Structures are given as structure tokens and as C-alpha cells.
Design a protein with these regions (language model features):
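Extracellular and organelle-lumenal recognition/adhesion modules and their flexible linkers in secreted
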Residues: 1-144
Length: 144
């Protein structure tokens, strides 16, 4: 079946990484040994189109970006997510490694500017970012 989780600022008693006061934490509150086959569970953040307009995504002048973040987990392994446009017709799946448990790890991903598809440059969702917390066997983590 599925698992449930809670999301909150400064979850548990984990100290934020050096230089930070807060973080967004997800804590599993009930788990089962499997996730339903077509299920994807994760965290989603939407960035307004005005904030990405200068990237010129969807044109031949598309600029590359760097996505960087801190991650902390009680599990090691390879994890993933995706950047996507508002129609979800195009996405950029990514993966990253957590090499050590219960330690903050800094992740940096370089993303080539997409030259195709439509990217909103108004007050709608310009780009979305998903971080996968778990996927079923027939579902890729947030890829199109």
C-alpha cells in the first residue's frame, strides 16, 4: 500500500546546515513495505514565470541554470526529481546521491537550458521542481 508523511519547517530535532536558520522537512509517519504501482509521492515547488523570463527557455537562446540544495536523510542511495514546464509537456528528470545517513549533503546539478516547448513568463507557473519521496514500480519519478 502507501505511506503517510508530514511536512513542516525544521522537522524533528535536526539542526539546519551551517549558515541556515530553517529547512523544509518531510517525516514518514506511517510506512508499509511497498507503494502502489502507479503512485508518485513527493514535494513540489512552483516558480512564477516572471522569475524565469530572462532564462529564455523554449528558444534557441535558452540559458543553463544550476540547481543546488542541501539534503538530509536517514537513508542512503540515489534519489530523484524533475524540473517541468507548466503544461508538463517537457520535464528534466534528475538524480542525486545521498552517501551518508543523518548528515547534510550539498547537491549541485547543472541543467542545460531547454530550447523546446513553452515556458510561461507571466504570473503563472514558469517552472516546477519536484523532489521524489517514493514511486511505485510502474511510475518513473516525475518524468514525462
Amino acid at each position: 500500500s502507501n505511506f503517510t508523511y508530514s511536512v513542516q519547517q525544521n522537522a524533528g530535532s535536526v539542526t539546519p546546515p551551517a549558515g541556515y536558520t530553517n529547512y523544509l522537512g518531510a517525516t514518514v509517519t506511517a510506512s508499509n513495505s511497498s507503494i502502489s504501482s502507479g503512485t508518485a509521492i513527493g514535494l513540489r515547488h512552483k516558480i512564477e514565470g516572471y522569475n524565469i523570463a530572462d532564462l529564455a527557455w523554449g528558444t534557441s537562446s535558452a540559458k543553463s541554470v544550476t540547481l543546488s540544495f542541501w539534503v538530509y536523510s536517514s537513508l542512503t542511495g540515489t534519489f530523484g526529481g524533475a524540473l517541468w514546464n507548466s503544461s508538463q509537456a517537457l520535464s528534466y528528470p534528475f538524480s542525486y546521491s545521498i552517501p551518508q545517513t543523518n548528515t547534510w549533503t550539498y547537491v549541485t546539478l547543472n541543467i542545460a537550458g531547454p530550447t523546446s516547448s513553452t515556458w510561461v513568463t507571466n504570473n503563472g507557473t514558469g517552472v516546477g521542481i519536484d523532489f521524489s519521496l517514493g514511486t511505485g514500480t510502474t511510475r518513473l519519478p516525475y518524468s514525462k
